[in-house]
A protein has these predicted regions:
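Short helix-coil transition sites and intra-membrane helix breaks within transmembrane domains
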Residues: 37-43, 74-83, 103, 140-143
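Hydrophobic alpha-helical segments of integral membrane proteins
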Residues: 10, 14-21, 42-57, 71, ...
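Hydrophobic alpha-helical transmembrane segments of multi-pass integral membrane proteins
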Residues: 62-98, 102
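Single conserved hydrophobic/aromatic residue that forms the stacking wall/gate
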Residues: 1-13
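Membrane-embedded helical hairpins/re-entrant loop segments and their flanking transmembrane helices
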Residues: 104, 111-143, 153-158
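Transmembrane alpha-helical segments and their short flanking loops
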Residues: 87-95, 131, 139, 143-145, ...
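Membrane-interfacial loop-to-helix junctions in multi-pass transporters
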Residues: 17-24, 54-66, 96-100, 196-203
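Hydrophobic core segments of alpha-helical transmembrane domains in multi-pass membrane transport
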Residues: 6-7, 24-36, 69-74, 107-118, ...
Length: 225
């Protein structure tokens, strides 16, 4: 019996070392090698190309780009399209192109904010669980955590995605139109003190959030109880 207990403890120790140390370490090494060998070179070339393109973009073309980046942030809620838009915004920060980061941040905040507001305005369109999560969803939106919209999108992907993309694209457009700028890659409303034209950014958020909420109210039908 004691021998069995000792073997079980040894197996537990080995398993804990394997899962707590070896697997994370090997995963980190793999990702590091992958970044250095496969991802960084093309990303560096993309960075150089993007810098050249941004230098030549003025007026209407920047409005289009801001709209596109805002909409991309709401396309897959933290997936590859979302991350591509986010990387574009962070790369623009290197050249002090703060307006695009503002469009990206506004676009990423709109889905949770719009869904949270829709839960409050149109409670019959959502389940009791979704309504209870509305405050948390609003908080995630305020802090630029786009993934807060994911549970709602999984339940009703078409309607939620259409509403979120429309609101986010509109918010991205307005941030460029009003000359907003964001000098940091993350933070949401906590970055308002360091933003360029904070009132304009709040206007973009308000319009985008309301657009998404109203579209959800129109697209989603009341649930049958």
């Amino acid at each position: 019996l004691h021998l069995c207990d000792r073997r079980q403890r040894q197996m537990c120790i080995r398993d804990s070392i394997k899962t707590g140390l070896l697997v994370p370490l090997l995963s980190l090494l793999f990702v590091g090698v992958l970044m250095v060998m496969a991802i960084n070179p093309p990303l560096g070339r993309f960075n150089a190309w993007l810098s050249i393109q941004l230098d030549g973009m003025q007026g209407g073309s920047r409005l289009v780009l801001g709209t596109l980046l805002g909409g991309m942030m709401a396309t897959d809620y933290g997936g590859p399209i979302n991350k591509a838009a986010y990387v574009s915004g962070t790369l623009a920060l290197v050249d002090q192109q703060y307006d695009l980061m503002a469009a990206v941040m506004a676009g990423g905040m709109i889905p949770p904010l719009g869904i949270g507001l829709a839960c409050l305005l149109f409670p019959t369109r959502f389940t009791s669980t979704e309504r209870c999560s509305a405050p948390q969803t609003l908080l995630m939106g305020a802090t630029f955590v786009t993934e807060g919209a994911l549970p709602f999108a999984l339940r009703d992907p078409l309607r939620v995605s259409l509403a979120c993309i429309a609101g986010s694209a509109l918010a991205g457009f307005i941030t460029i139109l009003l000359g907003c700028g964001c000098p940091a890659p993350h933070g949401g409303l906590f970055l308002l003190p360091v933003m360029e034209n904070p009132p304009g950014f709040l206007i973009a958020l308000a319009v985008g959030t309301l657009t998404t909420a109203l579209l959800l109210g129109m697209l989603k039908k009341p649930l049958k109880h």
